[in-house]
């Protein structure tokens, strides 16, 4: 018996028509199969997820980002089928799903691993860990006030920063918030972390690309800080000042189909209007 998961963004496949067609395509290509359906990533956090050989994600990059933090933990690969705008992470378009499902079951694919980022902090005496595929963002909680941060890299003092916040992105996340804040584009499979200030008050402070083994410590001088992981606000953290950011021990595994893999540079050109 093969166990296949489907995670659908119900805001994009509102009536479930694509979901139904994909279930039918799976059953047409594999007779001894059980399909588990998840809506908006609910349930992916459960331990039974580790029994799935793959999760087909119906949605966009945001849907994959949300699912990845659960699936990476259980070492389950993702096959992304895009609904809506062109994305960096989805592998194929919804109009081509029959070909994609057929190729998967024929074994015509390979798995591309993407580094993830981890943030460790302590909140109310409890150690907390968060994992993201794109980025970890530390921003000020007090609107209108200047925030100051002390930045350390591998135990060495790097700089004292006055800014609206700090982004630590993976190579995958370099084309997201980090790019908007002036960071560089990094090829997504490179093992790297990128530290980018948000609206730094000095033009001398720029992004820095680091080895993926680097340990970044952010110490906030503000009492109220907002921690955001892959665009999802974790909490309004009162009296939390220290954040330790490293590469995550988990990897996001993306399925790339033979004969269908999209050229990264064409996606980059279309997304960024180059």
From Swiss-Prot:
Keyword Transmembrane helix among record annotations: no
Cofactor: a divalent metal cation
Gene3D superfamilies, sorted: Probable inorganic polyphosphate/atp-NAD kinase, domain 1, Probable inorganic polyphosphate/atp-NAD kinase, domain 2
E.C. designation(s): 2.7.1.23
Binding site for NAD(+): 61-62, 66, 134-135, 145, 164, 175-180
Keyword field: ATP-binding, Cytoplasm, Kinase, NAD, NADP, Nucleotide-binding, Transferase
GO cellular component: cytoplasm
Catalytic activity: NAD(+) + ATP = ADP + NADP(+) + H(+)
UniProt main location, coarse: cytoplasm
Name of the top EC class for this enzyme: transferase
Coiled coil: none
One example of a Gene Ontology biological process annotation: NADP biosynthetic process
Places the protein is found: Cytoplasm
Superkingdom to which the source organism belongs: Bacteria
GO molecular function: ATP binding; metal ion binding; NAD binding; NAD+ kinase activity
Catalytic residues (positions): 61 (proton acceptor)
Similarity section: Belongs to the NAD kinase family.
Function recorded in the entry: Involved in the regulation of the intracellular balance of NAD and NADP, and is a key enzyme in the biosynthesis of NADP. Catalyzes specifically the phosphorylation on 2'-hydroxyl of the adenosine moiety of NAD to yield NADP.
Name this protein carries in UniProt: NAD kinase
Source organism (scientific name): Clostridium tetani (strain Massachusetts / E88)
Gene name as annotated: nadK
